[in-house]
Amino acid sequence: MLSCLGLAFLLLSLLIVQPQVLSCRVGDQRECDASPFVPGHNLIGEGFDMVTMQRKGAYVIDMETYLNPNRTCTLCSNQLKGHQLQKVILIKVKSWTRACSGTITLMIAAFKIFLCVKYASARLDVVGTQSTVYKFASNMMREDRYTFSTQKRMFSHYSYRVSAAPPFSSEFLKDLARLPRYYNSSTSSHYKDFLHTYGTHYIHQVRLGGYVARVTAARTCLSTLNGMSSNDVHSCVSMGIEVGLGNFKLSNVPSPCSKFLQNHGFSTVFSSYIHHHYTVISGGNGWSGEFSLTHNDSLGFKNWQHTLKDHPDVVFFFLRPIHLLIPTKTKRVGIKVTATKYLEDNAMESSPREPECTGNTPNLARNCCPQQVLKGTLRVTSIRAWGLNGDYAGATERLANKRLEIFVNITDVINSDYPYWNVDYNFGKVYTLQVLAVEIWDEDLQYDDLLGSCVRYLSQGDNSFTCAAESGRFEVQYTLTCDPYLTGERCGHLSH
């Protein structure tokens, strides 16, 4: 199984880990009973569900036994806690680490979903389809095209791993013993229940500490309209993170990015925000993980950071399939089959790539996003009039004059009080907030008389309108076609 912390085509890890030499010794039972456990001792050996991306709270490995058969244990000096002696369970304590900070940034391509795991050769993005982050991203993508970017600030203090032959927890052994020996259609429900309790994998190795991750969903085409690529969005949010954590000033942020961070100042007809975010926090206490991107809002972050040594949580882990632990071959096969089916049933097809438009299509960027809104193609298809009174010379001579702003197109002269111009005037690309002005004239030898005029705002689709003349009326028919990926009455909205 190939695991990937999600959707990424770029992953930059700047975490600096500084391991300390462990100082451990053997303690007798009296010392062992009196000493506290190492922080987060129970955050390893736990079952894990790869679909929900959540720990199950049920332990595969015995995480409480700390005494060896000779009634001794291992006591280690925790340099992060004033060299306090702390006991370890029968696992491997790899190292303490100094409180070390760094930023793990993750550029996430549009249309893709977090927390993907390639499962075997199924060619499916499997994992996390029931996780809260996945649901956030899915809900965003139902609404519009989004580009996702994640910034994570991580602190790692402790590192543990399960020993080569770990002792099983008593509950795990009992549930395993109750499991039918063979997997088939009549026993499959028992295997599903077992999977529901313990998950698909177990945590084999961990780094403990804390992290806060901010998942930003930015409207792809709205960003493009305002001159920001997906890379620009990612860099901008990264600068906003530094502003919020007190490492940068908003005044030093370029103007387009500053407006982006403040979610305003974008010259479109949209009323909705250009970006939304979802926050995930692990470890520590006393802070929700929320902070501003436009001013120094770092107090909660700094206070939370100080709580991580006493209240660590998993910030990085290695998983192993539970079935690899099962000693009985038939049960091992049954658990593997059940887990495989569960993962495949909750998988999604591989996320589509961001569309790419090539060629010379006007008003369309390479990512198939409009470069301007309120743009379309205008065609006037017919004009007809009735009941017009012309000059005294006989049948009235008529001239239809259509214009859009300074663009003027003049029809042929028709000698009738009921003229009909079956025409196709293509005005080409127009700004849809302009108006269509039509004038009907009576052409004379000396002076032309204006018989009627009309002005209308444009609307998308096939349209007609009727206007009054000095006597009679006239009707105009036209078609306004929005540019690709634009919609709305005046082509002012982005289509999904």
Predicted regions and their residues:
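Hydrophobic beta-strand residues in large extracellular and virion-surface proteins
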Residues: 378-380, 436-438, 476-478
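Residues at beta-strand starts and edge strands
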Residues: 231-237, 374-376, 396-398, 434, ...
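Peripheral membrane lipid-binding modules
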Residues: 390-472
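Classical eukaryotic N-terminal signal peptides for Sec-dependent ER targeting/secretion
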Residues: 1-12
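Generic "edge-of-domain/loop-turn" microfeature
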Residues: 244-246, 259, 285, 387, ...
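Acidic, phospholipid-interacting surfaces centered on C2/C2-like domain membrane-binding loops
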Residues: 337, 341-370, 389-392, 459-496
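Membrane-permeabilization and membrane-interfacing ectodomains
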Residues: 4, 16-381, 386-388, 421-424
